[in-house]
Each structure stands twice: as C-alpha cells, then as structure tokens.
C-alpha cells in the first residue's frame, strides 16, 4: 500500500529566493515532483531583489523530507535557511501544563489558597474523606498510567519515550471532555510494583486509565486494581477499542441488513484489544466467532492450549468461541464469513480472501499504519470497510470513546466500570449517526463531532446509576 504524504511528517523550510522570475513556482514543482505536498507558502519578508518564503509541506518520512530539502537547496538562486519539523515544534517543552483556577493577587488570596486558610479545608476532608471529591481536583482527575511496554506500534520503548503519548492522551481528555488527566510513566515493568504504585497514588484521582501495558500482564494488572480500588480502572487499549468496534459494527450491520446474532465473525489477533473486542461482542449478542493468531485458528484442542493457564485470555477464547471446532489458518477461516475484524499485523489477507467472504461482507482492518488488507482492494468486494487510519472513511479511533466514558464515570462518581456501561457507551456512539446519515462510508462519527462525548458520557452515567456503582449525581467540574 503506497504511503501518502502526512501532516505527521510536516516540515517548514525557510528559503530566500530571487524576487522575479519563476523561483517561487520552482519551489512548488520541486516539492510536488518529489512526492511531497505543499500545504503552505508564506512570504515572511519582501524586497526589490529577494523574497523570504516559508514553504510548509507534508512528506512521507524524515528521509523523504531530507530528500526534498536537498532538492530545494539545489535550485539556482535559492538560499536555504532554517528547516523545522512541525511535529517536534509542537512537543517542545511538552504539550500540557497545570494552570490555577484562581488568581493569586494579594495576601487575602494567598491565605485562602494556601496557608493558613487551607488547613481548614484539610481538616474538613480528614473528618469526612468523601469531601475530597468536592473540595479538590480529585473529582475531575484521571491518572493515565503506563510502563512503556507496548506503546502504539513502537513496542517496549520505556517510560520516558512513552511520555509524549501520555501527554497527548491527557490533552485529548481535556479537549473532548474537560477532564484533567495526568501522565504517570512508571519506571518498572513488574506487575506487583505497578499495582502497588497505582494503589498508593489512587487517593488523588477519580479514575485510572491504563495505557500501553503489554499483554498478558495488562489483564492481571487491570483485574487486581479493579478489585483493590473504589474508583474505575479502564485499560483503554482493550475496552476503548472494543467499544468503538462494537459501535461501528452495529451500524455496519444496519447498512447490510444483518443481525448481530446471525453473523459469523472472524478475528485476527488474540492480544489485549482482540480479547476485549471478542468479550464485548459476545456480550452484545455475537454467537458465531472464530479467532486466529500467529499459530492459526484458536480451538480447544490446539496443542499449545491443552495445558494453558485456565485463567489466561487465550484459554477463555478457546472455551468461548469457535462452536463448530474449526481448525486451520486465518485465510481458511475467513471464507464465507460475514465479518472480519483485524487487530494484528499488516497484509495478512489479500483481495481474494475478502472476495471469498459472504455477500455484503464487513471488513474492519485496524492494524496501523498498514492494515491487515489494503482497504482500497477490500472495497472492491466488501460492502463496508473500516480502518484505524484517518485517510480512509470509517476510522476506528479510541478518541471517540475514552473522554466520554470517563466523563460519565466521573459525573456519576462511579466506583467501577463494567460491561453494561461499555455496552451503553457503544450504543450511544452508534446512535450519534442518525438514520438519514448512515451509509457504507459513514458508520462511525468523526472524533470532532460535538455530540459524541456528551452522548457517551450520558449513557455511561445512567448505566453506572442503574448498576448501583454511582455514589451521587455529581456536579461536573
């Protein structure tokens, strides 16, 4: 699949060029003929003989950007100035900050914000610990916790290298749900240590978002923290993905006119996301599911599963899917299937595999940046196609879920998060797409749809109340 220029590799190059002639058009031609895309051309200084121009361009990689810069340098009469990577510029000094809600202008302000007045508030909380939600930032705070062991598609890069992702997550919490999220990058990958650290910092937060922790450790860590804490613990890589997939599948099935209990679903990938998707789809009514991993189709009799830990995710998959006892490869399993969901690796299927699926097939190829099957090829025979990419229709993106889910949990002062709340979130997200809007290229709303976070939050809040997990109907921050 050809890589298109992306704003992720956006560069601004400052150049001095002759004022007359064709120098400016030569700049544009040099970028476009090299496979880049000019997104901005700004004159920052002008004289009778010279122009200073900032050329902003999207490229496909840092190497591609370097090639284009060298081509610009070679144009006669052009003097190359500063070259800026716009993504790195956005990260200089970090992307988030702490800000005070009240100005501190004089002694009166100081004595109320800090000592001695703050002591009265401390004692009020000491007498009634529940007042911490009312009188501190706790009620609107979420810890975004990682050990850096499974960051995006980058792998085990450690806590410092994971920090830019956690900052970005915190920024999205604020942008879409008004939540104060705090990046917590732990310099340990010991499960016991992670559990103890999160338990120790939990008093300052109303929720815990686990992020980019490798499987199978993530399952144990989440389960232990849910058992130990009286605030919701949500591993977004699992459940955020699962909720968006269920919402998108709900609408895709509406497009093709099939029922969730009637379709055969084949999934590629049995890791954290795949397991969570499978469990939520099962709770939503999927009865015929088959999962394949690197060893082929998962079934109860597979040699590597006979002695597997009965509590393991893979054992759960073997015991709760594949009722027909299918064996073999992913390609064999997908023949005649109604739905394919990929959360695994690029290019595991070809166009011929999609063509061998049932009529009006649904394909969710979610591996990033390269999907399990080229979406352009899949569209030739599948009725509905979704990916994890922003440059194709129907992007499956967790940003559609985690802000609204936590907004609802925090507003309800929920002590936990459960399957019913996640099902409610998926239904609410699916319903944001109105009946007269629904079509094969629009089964899931944009992350910038203003209705999304509020709809998801409202559904989760009501589900928390119905489950008896809500303390009160809290006032939002």
Each PLM stretch: what is its role?
Residues 152, 159-177, 229, 235, ...:
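Glycine-rich phosphate/diphosphate-binding loop of Rossmann-like nucleotide-binding domains
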Residues 80-83, 183, 209-212, 233-236, ...:
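General beta-strand structural signal in soluble alpha/beta enzymes
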Residues 314-384, 389-391:
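Rossmann-like adenosine-cofactor binding region
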Residues 232, 236-237, 256, 365-475:
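Adenosine-phosphate binding glycine-rich loop
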Residues 39-44, 81-83, 184, 211, ...:
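Flexible, glycine/charged-enriched surface loops at secondary-structure junctions
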Residues 1-92:
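A conserved regulatory-domain signal marking ACT and ACT-like small-molecule sensing domains
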Residues 80-263:
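Glycine/serine-rich phosphate-binding loop and adjoining beta1-alpha1 elements at the start
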